[in-house]
């Protein structure tokens, strides 16, 4: 459904009257019908009685909505403003309309409305445009509805520009909700600018309103448009602070002209967390290694100083208990503790290293082994050892002789050092055995002992089996069984007789078990031999039969003859 409004223009000056059409109230449905506007005299007054009269005239002059669609019904409610602000219930209704927006077919939200600063000639143009739009709508009603995705309530738009801020003449200024159901509004023409109501400029002047807001007030919306500038600036500032972490330490440490120094972190930060506060990586890995090395040295020096201080305090207390104060002062003036001298030397070394007075290449790595050191020393062109060069310079104050360095002394000293180191006897490296290897050796010794015991037992059984004569044992058993039993003498004690009977019975049972075992083993062996022979005979007979028979004249096999042949072969084998 497309509803186009008619434009009304009066001859009043633009400064006196700001509103250009009749007051429009929000609807519960998805469309806002815009009809012919009344005179500006009725719009100027804000009394309730005049508004009631306007509503009666509006409903009398309005075309019946039932002619458009029998199911479409507009539910209108009054919006009586008190001092230009809507009530709480109206604002809740507007918010509900925004949240419960629905898809509307054939909905045209464009409604070009003319401005106040046009002359009487513009009236004729407006009426002509209205008639043309009416005829176009009649023709367009017969055409099919354009396809619009259900999730598009308004076309995509770019960021809101200052020209899209609601001007006082628009009905959405502090009255209408910023919803997706609002029509297009033309921009007010600037003084001396082109006429935006001409047919050539009407399409270009129509712009979408900004995205819907929860607050319908224009002043709050203007504040929101200005707010992201400050938010963006604070976000950029936070990003710069996070990315420049440790940059100040790196800049102080990388300053030239003798001003570079290493600043230690806070004492509450442990040594394990030094990597978290290391300098910025943009200054290179060299500076990071230098900072970590110096921080560890400074922290260890601080611990040594505290330890030495505690020892001195304990020594002073013990010394005061033994001697008087005068003697202690004399001893202090005469004697110098070597530990203090060592602490002073270490402190000076740490200070020089902290202030970068000692030239060290922190990224240098040993790329060669001891065998290739002599080859490196021969190549004097690439040799550059700053510490040794400073030690072997003849004139430290002469700047002209800095480039001319005698490498012969350096080479000679390095050769002597390498020869001396090679002459020292190298102790063999002690390697710890692997726990798995130790466990495997123990298991191997246990298993070998078990295997040897089993082998010895097998040998003993073989000897006993070779020496035994089962036939003689059977003869002895038969002779014993045939002999009559001798009566026991009364003189023998019954206990000794029972013991002898038990021992004899055990020996006989053992012999019987042994003989039964031998018979069983012989029977199993004979069975296996016969089975193997039968299988071989079957294979041979089948092979002969297959070779003798032809495809055309196949002979019938007689099973009786086969059985006879098998029986004869078995009888021959048994006779043998």
From Swiss-Prot:
Bias type Basic and acidic residues, positions: 420-430
InterPro entries listed in its UniProt record: Dsn1/Mis13, EF_Hand_1_Ca_BS
Taxonomic superkingdom: Eukaryota
Record field: compositional bias (Polar residues): 1-11
One GO cellular component, as annotated: kinetochore
Residues bearing the modification Phosphoserine: 250
Compositionally biased region (Basic residues): 235-246
Keywords: Cell cycle, Cell division, Centromere, Chromosome, Kinetochore, Mitosis, Nucleus, Phosphoprotein
Protein's GO biological process: attachment of spindle microtubules to kinetochore; cell division; chromosome segregation; meiotic sister chromatid cohesion, centromeric; spindle attachment to meiosis I kinetochore
Compartments reported by the entry: Nucleus; Chromosome, Centromere, Kinetochore
Disordered, as annotated region: 1-22, 35-64, 185-205, 227-246, 412-437
Function: Acts as an essential component of the kinetochore MIND complex, which is required for the spindle checkpoint and kinetochore integrity. MIND plays a role in establishing a bipolar spindle-kinetochore interaction by joining kinetochore subunits contacting DNA to those contacting microtubules.
Note, other: Present with 1310 molecules/cell in log phase SD medium.
Oligomer and partners: Component of the MIND kinetochore complex, which is composed of at least MTW1, NNF1, NSL1 and DSN1. Interacts with NSL1.
The name this protein goes by in its record: Kinetochore-associated protein DSN1
Species assigned in the record: Saccharomyces cerevisiae (strain ATCC 204508 / S288c)
Gene name linked to the record: DSN1
